[in-house]
Amino acid sequence: EAEGTYVKEEYEMEEAVITGIASDTSEVKVTIRQVPDAPNVAARVFGALAAANVNLDMIIQNVSEAGFTDISFTTPGADLPRAKETMERIVPEIGAREFIVDEDIAKVSLVGTGMKSSPGVAARAFSTLGENQINILAISTSPIRLSVVVDGAQAAAAVRCLHKAFDLDSDSVFEETQLSAEEIAAKMNKGR
C-alpha cells in the first residue's frame, strides 16, 4: 500500500434537539402575594435579596390585577433561611399582603443546543407533561435550556415522560443532579 493521506467523505451527524434531562429537587419557591404594581418595587425586593446573599434561579411575575401582582422566585434550599428573613422585613415595607414558601418543588430541565433552531420543543414538552397530569408551576427558557417547576412528588414522572417523548437513551438522564443546565450541556457535548 502507498503512503500518503487518505481522503474520505465526511458526514455530519444530525444535531440532537434535546441531549439530556435534569431534575433538581434542591430548590424552593417563594411567592410574594399582592405586591403593589408600582415602579421600583421589584428592584427593592431583589435588591434586599441580593444584599442578603440569596441566590436566585427563576423569577416569575404575574399579570397585574387591580393594581397588584404576585412575584415568585426559586432559590436553593440552603438560601431559604436568609430568603425568609428578608421577606419578613421587605413584605411589609413594600405593602404586599404576605409571602408563602413551597419547599416541595422540582425543577426539570431539558437541555440541548439543537433547541435554538427547532421550533415546537416547548409545545411538545408542555403537551407531554399535561397528558401525564403534571402541572407546570413556572417556566424559564434560554437558547439551550427549557426548565419547568413541578410538584416535587411528580419530578421522577416528569423526567420519565419527557425522556420518552424526546427519545433519549438512559445515559442522557441526570436525575436529581446539582449541576446547572449549562454544566450538563457542556458535559454532554464533551462526549461527542
Task: Identify the function of each model-found stretch.
Residues 1-192:
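C-terminal catalytic "cap/lid" subdomain
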